[in-house]
C-alpha cells in the first residue's frame, strides 16, 4: 500500500504510525470500549466481552511499532452517555495500561461524552473540531465540521466512518472487509464555511481509518444506497482509493 511520507498503516492492523517530528505516534480510530454493554442495552444482543483482547492488542501495537504516543481518533468509548458500569471499568483498565507505557491523546468523538472529563488527568484531549499534531498531521473524528486549520496539514487522519467494502466472488459469494480510504481533500467541501482559501493549490491527503473494533459495523463504501456518516466526506473525498488491512489496493473506492 502506498504510504504518505508521514502516515503509514500497520500491515494487517486497523492502525497507522505517524511521524510527528519529535514523536512517533500510533493512531487508531473507533475503539468503542464497552460495545458489548451497549449492544446488550440497545439491541438485546448478548456477546462475550472482548475488553481484555482490545486492551492487549493496543498495548502490543504500541510496543511493536515503538510508538511514543497513542492517538485515538475519537469514539474511545461506545455508549453516547457518560461511561459507567462495565464500560467505565474497561476504559479505566485500558487507559491505565496504555498510559503506563506512553502518553495518550483522545480526539473527541460523538461517543465520547463525559470521557474527557472523567479521565482529564490521564488523557491529552483535542476537541471535536480537530487539531494539528507535530505541525503536519491533522486529526479529527469526523462527526462534525473540522476546523479549517486542518487544511494547513500535510495529511488529515479521521475516524467515525468505519469504512468497509463488500467483495463478491465469481459464484456470487460475498464478504465484508474493513478498509482504508485515501485521497486528496477538496478544500471547498471540507469545511463548513467554504470561503477559506488555505491550501487550495496543495490540499492535504485525507486518510479515513477503519474501525479498530471489528464489532462496530460500518459504511459499505462501494454499495449503492450507502451514504457517508460524516457531513463533509462525500464532497471532501470525491475520489480516492480503498485498501484492505493487508495493504491490497482495490482502486477507486466507489467502483470496487
Go through each PLM region and give its residues.
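Acidic, His/Gly-rich catalytic cores of divalent-metal-dependent hydrolytic chemistry
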Residues: 168-256
Amino acid at each position: 500500500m502506498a504510504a504518505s511520507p508521514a502516515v503509514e498503516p500497520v500491515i494487517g492492523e486497523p492502525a497507522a504510525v505517524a511521524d510527528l517530528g519529535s514523536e512517533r505516534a500510533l493512531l487508531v480510530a473507533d475503539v468503542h470500549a464497552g460495545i458489548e454493554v451497549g449492544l446488550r442495552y440497545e439491541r438485546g444482543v448478548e456477546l462475550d466481552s472482548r475488553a481484555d483482547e482490545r486492551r492487549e492488542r493496543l498495548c502490543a501495537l504500541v510496543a511493536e511499532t515503538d510508538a511514543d504516543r497513542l492517538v485515538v481518533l475519537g469514539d474511545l468509548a461506545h455508549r453516547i452517555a457518560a461511561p459507567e458500569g462495565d464500560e467505565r471499568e474497561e476504559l479505566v483498565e485500558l487507559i491505565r495500561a496504555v498510559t503506563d507505557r506512553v502518553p495518550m491523546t483522545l480526539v473527541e468523538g460523538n461517543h465520547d461524552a463525559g470521557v474527557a472529563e472523567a479521565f482529564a488527568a490521564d488523557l491529552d484531549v483535542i476537541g471535536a473540531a480537530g487539531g494539528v499534531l507535530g505541525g503536519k498531521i491533522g486529526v479529527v473524528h469526523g462527526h462534525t465540521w473540522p476546523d479549517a486549520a486542518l487544511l494547513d496539514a500535510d495529511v488529515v487522519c479521521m475516524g467515525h466512518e468505519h469504512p468497509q467494502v463488500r467483495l463478491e466472488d465469481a459464484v456470487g459469494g460475498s464478504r465484508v472487509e474493513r478498509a482504508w480510504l485515501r485521497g486528496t481533500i477538496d478544500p471547498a467541501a471540507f469545511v463548513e464555511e467554504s470561503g477559506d482559501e488555505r491550501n487550495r493549490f496543495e490540499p492535504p491527503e485525507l486518510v479515513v481509518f477503519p474501525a479498530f473494533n471489528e464489532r462496530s459495523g460500518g459504511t459499505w463504501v462501494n454499495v449503492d444506497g450507502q451514504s457517508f456518516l460524516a457531513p463533509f466526506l462525500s464532497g471532501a473525498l470525491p475520489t480516492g482509493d480503498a485498501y484492505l488491512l493487508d495493504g491490497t489496493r482495490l482502486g477507486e473506492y466507489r467502483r470496487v
